[in-house]
A protein has these predicted regions:
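Mitochondrial intermembrane space
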Residues: 1-162
């Protein structure tokens, strides 16, 4: 396990986490069965609030409510627009203690087992894609470029940051 993941999980466990999170994260590994358990807990919470859970593309990190259940939730409300505004808050509240951190680390530890920073991953991808303009940039300069909303990157960047 990368030091980064151990350090981040230690910090998380030192904070106030749910019993499920403590159980799943204690050994610094998240199995498929543990992710399924976290998803089930999230789905129960959403169902208790009248929404059906949706996990997007199944990457372990995406969560929300199905469009059908959002439509039904809005239709059942006296104020459909207010109900629509409540859905992200409900989804986040249900994710807290269930899928939020467990899903994040499940995804991150598999897609980036070395625990490299996003900036390191971008630099490596951009350099291998032949994007010359970033070659001599410091990490700070690259971060500023990535954060600059007026910057129009070359097409190769899409493969790195999508």
């Amino acid at each position: 396990m990368a030091d980064r993941w151990r350090t981040e999980i230690d910090a998380l466990l030192a904070d106030d986490v749910s019993a499920l999170e403590r159980q799943v994260l204690a050994d610094y590994e998240i199995t498929d069965a543990e992710l399924a358990e976290a998803r089930d807990a999230y789905a129960r919470c959403m169902s208790d609030r009248g929404l059906e859970a949706d996990f997007g593309d199944g990457d372990g990190f995406s969560y929300g409510a199905t469009q059908e259940s959002q439509d039904a939730f809005r239709s059942a409300s006296a104020d459909p627009e207010a109900a629509l505004d409540q859905i992200p808050t409900i989804a986040d509240a249900c994710a807290d203690g269930t899928i939020w951190d467990i899903g994040l680390y499940y995804h991150e530890m598999r897609s980036n087992p070395e625990g490299r920073s996003l900036l390191e991953l971008w630099r490596e991808c951009l350099e291998s894609a032949g994007v010359d303009e970033i070659h001599d940039l410091t990490d700070q300069e690259l971060q500023e470029l990535v954060d600059d909303e007026s910057y129009v990157p070359p097409p190769e960047v899409g493969t790195c940051v999508s």
